[in-house]
Regions:
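A short, small-residue-rich loop immediately preceding and capping a beta-strand
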Residues: 1-37, 116-129
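Rossmann-fold NAD(P)-dependent oxidoreductase module
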Residues: 21, 25, 48, 111, ...
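A glycine- and small-aliphatic-rich helix-loop capping segment at beta-alpha/alpha-beta transitions
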Residues: 24-34, 135-144, 166-168
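Short, acidic/small-residue loops that bind anionic groups at enzyme active sites
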Residues: 31-48, 140-154
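Small/polar-residue-rich loop-to-helix segments that shape phosphate-bearing ligand pockets
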Residues: 34-119, 162, 166-199
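Glycine-rich beta-alpha junction loops
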Residues: 86-89, 124-128, 151-156, 177, ...
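Conserved PLP-enzyme active-site core in the AAT-like
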Residues: 107, 128-132, 137
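Short acidic/glycine-rich loop or secondary-structure boundary segments that cap or lie
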Residues: 129-131, 155-159, 180, 190
Length: 199
């Protein structure tokens, strides 16, 4: 991109929010963008990404199926994956994404008296935002508040992984109302934080 190559195609799998940010960035840089979504993503979320110039591809199945299809087609077509989920040999972009999430914690700290924070409640998903916020708490706060990580009972990949001490895959049989939280496996990068900080 920095050399003026506008033929780059970026791709990601999403339930909505991450895909919107990738579509926005691609449009800003003049790149083509392919967004893979599961059949459970609402038409409104898909349209929001289309409105940003992305080509949205609906995949039969859940989020994990859309991620598998994204990786497959990206490999076949030489597209650049911009994913917030880490796996073996794909860690850099998810680390940058998590670093961006820590800005939210810094903004919170800058706006309130940090001694007044007693509890922080975080969504789990694949663990990226939760792991980043926990790292931000450790970095920016003197007094560590009680931190609660929540996830749907039908997609409790963080809780099940914490129980066994290793990443567990959840076969999601029932989608959550919060589609973006319906994730079956913890991302490798945040797992290194979550396994040592969540009970």
């Amino acid at each position: 991109v920095s050399k003026g190559n506008k033929d780059i195609v970026v791709a990601t799998a999403t339930a909505g929010n991450h895909g919107r940010s990738v579509a926005w960035g691609a449009r800003r840089l003049g790149l083509k963008c392919k967004i893979f979504i599961s059949e459970f993503v609402s038409d409104e979320r898909a349209q929001a990404m289309t409105n940003l110039g992305a080509d949205v591809l609906k995949v039969k199945g859940n989020y994990e199926k859309s991620l598998i299809e994204c990786i497959k087609q990206s490999t076949e077509n030489n597209w650049q994956i911009v994913q917030d989920v880490a796996w073996k040999d794909y860690m850099i972009v998810p680390k940058y994404t998590m670093a961006g999430y820590t800005v939210m914690m810094k903004e919170v700290i800058d706006q309130i008296n940090q001694n007044n924070i007693s509890h922080i409640i975080l969504q789990a998903g694949v663990g990226g935002m939760a792991g980043a916020m926990i790292a931000g708490v450790a970095r920016y706060l003197k007094n560590i508040p009680i931190t609660i990580v929540v996830e749907p009972d039908s997609a409790a990949c963080v809780m099940e992984s914490i129980k066994t001490g290793k990443i567990e895959k959840i076969d999601i049989k029932r989608e959550s109302l919060m589609g973006g939280m319906s994730c079956g496996e913890v991302s490798l990068v945040p797992w290194e934080i979550l396994k040592n900080s969540v009970k």
